[in-house]
């Protein structure tokens, strides 16, 4: 008998509600279909949203300062550092300034993935949320 493990859900009946799905997903159960066994032992529901406008604005201000951009240069959350003239050293300096401003530590692997103001703001909010309570006070 073959065994198949999965972490995804398929909705076939339009009458299925979110609460029914969450109840079913939170319990540990196995369902057998002929030769295949599907087990839902662990399922996480992850909801993410864009960073707060305040965080995006603070990141924009730091980017303008680090890149010595004129005050009238328009920046949006989608503005790419490279399109603003930033090279790899500029990006490192931006990340260092963000770490100092928000009192966070950005892993090198995360820093290399930051290419836009929005990505930086999202990462900052994620790191701030994960900080222990003692560090945030």
From Swiss-Prot:
Record has Cell inner membrane as a keyword: no
Gene Ontology molecular function terms on file: acyl carrier activity
PTM notes: 4'-phosphopantetheine is transferred from CoA to a specific serine of apo-ACP by acpS. This modification is essential for activity because fatty acids are bound in thioester linkage to the sulfhydryl of the prosthetic group.
Expression induction: By light. Down-regulated by sucrose in the dark.
GO biological process: cuticle development; fatty acid biosynthetic process; systemic acquired resistance
InterPro entries xrefs: ACP, ACP-like_sf, ACP_chloroplastic, PP-bd_ACP, Ppantetheine_attach_site
Transmembrane segments: none
Key words of the record: Chloroplast, Fatty acid biosynthesis, Fatty acid metabolism, Lipid biosynthesis, Lipid metabolism, Phosphopantetheine, Phosphoprotein, Plant defense, Plastid, Transit peptide
Location, primary (coarse class): plastid
GO (cellular component) term, any one: chloroplast
Chain positions found as O-(pantetheine 4'-phosphoryl)serine: 88
A Pfam family that the UniProt record links to this protein: PP-binding
Effect of inactivating the gene: Small and chlorotic plants with altered cuticule and reduced levels of fatty acids in leaves.
Subcellular location: Plastid, Chloroplast
Transit peptide location on this chain: 1-48
Role, per record: Carrier of the growing fatty acid chain in fatty acid biosynthesis that plays a major role in the biosynthesis of fatty acids in leaves. Required for the biosynthesis of chloroplast photosynthetic membrane lipids such as monogalactosyldiacylglycerol, digalactosyldiacylglycerol and phosphatidylglycerol. Is essential for the biosynthesis of the cuticular wax and cutin polymers in leaves, and for the establishment of systemic acquired resistance (SAR).
PANTHER family tied to this protein: ACYL CARRIER PROTEIN, ACYL CARRIER PROTEIN 4, CHLOROPLASTIC
Family listed: Belongs to the acyl carrier protein (ACP) family.
Protein name: Acyl carrier protein 4, chloroplastic
Gene source species: Arabidopsis thaliana
Phylogenetic placement of the source organism: Eukaryota, Viridiplantae, Streptophyta, Embryophyta, Tracheophyta
């Amino acid at each position: 008998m073959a065994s198949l493990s999965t972490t995804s859900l398929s909705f076939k009946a339009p009458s299925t509600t979110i609460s029914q799905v969450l109840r079913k997903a939170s319990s540990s159960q196995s369902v057998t279909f002929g030769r295949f066994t599907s087990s839902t032992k662990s399922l996480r529901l992850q909801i993410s949203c864009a960073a707060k406008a305040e965080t995006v604005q603070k990141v924009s201000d730091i980017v303008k300062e680090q890149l010595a951009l004129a005050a009238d240069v328009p920046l949006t959350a989608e503005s790419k550092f490279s399109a603003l003239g930033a090279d790899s050293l500029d990006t490192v300096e931006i990340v260092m300034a963000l770490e100092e401003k928000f009192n966070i530590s950005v892993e090198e692997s995360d820093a290399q993935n930051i290419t836009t103001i929005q990505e930086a703001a999202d990462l900052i909010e994620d790191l701030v949320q994960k900080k222990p309570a003692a560090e945030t006070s």
